[in-house]
Amino acid sequence: MTSPYPRPVGRVVVTGGSSGLGAAVVDAVRAAGGSPAVIDRVPFDDGGATPFAQADVSNHIEVEHAIAAIAAELDGIDAVVTAAGIDRCGTLGEVDAVEWERVIGVNLLGTVSTVRAALPYLEEVHGRAVIVASSLALRGVSDATAYCASKFGVLGFSRALAAETRGRLGVTTLIPAGMRTGFFDDRPEQYKPGADAQLIEAAEAARAIVFALQQPQGVEVRELVICPEEEPSWP
């Protein structure tokens, strides 16, 4: 039996909410009548309108404390969106081992830690987890072994989580193509998108996330691919 549609968005914790896709999700959740909260290493300041906890998602203890603090402030959590992510470009031999493992720590282990910490709150309300993967969770490319490995892992984790928590938690994997955000700003020029690159707007992906959050209990959007109409690399 399903509940009415659209389901209220509710109290949504967004990792990486200070910039990029995460910031767009914060705006979209608020526009849909929800109550966003942010976990990020980078300070988030909108005059106190949005609950914020500073944490490095690769540190599970910091994540646990951040989730607990936000849950206490909001009197619970209805959903999490794992938008925090980083990349280190270069061949396997070129990327320092510590930096390579850092990508896994943030993208994969940070996702796991966030969901694990939020799970007790989410299961109380049959909440939702929207887990952000990437089109590079479906195909491998050169000079991106860390990022591809992390996102392949995120996709596998999300699918297994959906099976493990069926009937208790809604799980959606978002699979976005490249987005027009600051994600590429610190890359060497050879790894930045070209002037003719087909990128989606973060706000478009954020609206898709809200769509998943609004699905009634009993209806699941398991995987959602967001890409340009003429996506050249799909799949």
Residue map of PLM features:
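Active-site helix of classical SDR
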Residues: V115, S150
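C-terminal helical subdomain
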Residues: T173-L174, P193-W234
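The beta1-alpha1 cofactor-binding region of Rossmann-like NAD(H)/NADP(H)-dependent oxidoreductases
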Residues: A55-H65, A97
